[in-house]
Amino acid sequence: MSKKIVSFQGLEGAYSDLVCRKFYKNFITLPCDTFQKTLDVVTNGTAELAIIPVENNIAGRVADMHFLLENIRLKIVAEHYHKIEHHLMAKKGCDLKNLRKVYSHTHAISQCKRNIKKLNLNSFNYMDTAGAAKFVKNNNEQGVSAIASKLASEIYGLKILIENFEDKSENITRFLV
């Protein structure tokens, strides 16, 4: 019997990937470039389930998702709440005093804005948190960092400079299945 597939938007190490791994351990995870593709692979039968974030108690609604949900014919079968723990990370050898830029998803940046300001970093939006971590890994510029999950730091070989970088510790995102 072949394993079932659960899709998510983003790269490996994204928070949606963490939710897939936590609640659907017997499934193969399928990263998708966009929310639309994440849903399309369920519609066309490639995946059995899709995990999508819909709102965060700090950053609010994930606007793209609410628009897409109005136009799909899939059924919501579950919801999961996941505590988001953002970590500030950079390449090995980089330290806090050398940082100038931070990359992450717009929601992650808004959830860490006070800490970003304390470090006097320029923030730049990226498609997803794991994508930002991969970007930092492949970037030769000095002083760049990402805000992403611990899993992303492990996957992309980055050093965590500050754990739990979010401004508020009770940072919860609601995901629909």
Describe the predicted segments one by one.
Residues 1-177:
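Domain-level signature for soluble enzymes in the chorismate/prephenate branch of the shikimate pathway
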